[in-house]
Amino acid sequence: MVAAVQNATGVSAGVADDALVKLEVRDLTIRYGNEAALSNVSLDIREHEIFGIIGPANAGKTSFLKTLNRMDMFNSNMHVDGDILFNGLDIRRLKNVYALRSRIGVVFPLPVGLPMTIYDNVALSPRLSGMKDKAELDVIVERCLTRAALWDEVKDRLDSLGSLLSG
């Protein structure tokens, strides 16, 4: 299904007409194989503007959000054309995707892990920060899962896919 994403007419209430455009999307098309999830979407989101994306299931909302912080890179079947500028910079040309994700976050309604084990999902951030020591990672993973009240449930299946956890 192809969804049309449109910005509200005019500038949102409480946002100045001359407010800085923080996010520009131009002619964005998202495809899975030959099927378009979105086609030729263009919009501007201004500083301090509150912007919502609504639509029916399978209309391309999540696909759109994943492109904003380059989470689409985790899906080899997802092809993105068009331009996305954040603070005037093309997000596809940014070398540090983690810095981008620290500025553009996406919170999904249900927990969504990466296609890795439970252990690797929890250890991802420390590893990206340069931590390599297995003993240190083990301590961090156990501490994080304990704080999330999950340790007792998953301690014997840390090598299982995180996506297999019930929601």
Regions from the language model: what does each represent?
Residues 1-29:
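ABC-family P-loop ATPase nucleotide-binding domain
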Residues 69, 119-128, 138, 142, ...:
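Short helical segment in ABC ATPase nucleotide-binding domains corresponding to the A-loop/adjacent helical element
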Residues 83-90, 134-156:
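Conserved ABC ATPase "signature" region
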Residues 15-22, 30-40, 47, 72-77, ...:
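A short, flexible loop at the N-terminus of ABC-type nucleotide-binding domains that lies
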Residues 76-79, 89-105, 128:
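ABC ATPase NBD coupling module
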Residues 59, 73-77, 110-120:
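Conserved catalytic motifs of ABC-family nucleotide-binding domains
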Residues 52, 66, 83-84, 98-110, ...:
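ABC nucleotide-binding domain signature
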Residues 54-56:
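The feature captures the beta-strand-to-loop junction immediately N-terminal to the Walker
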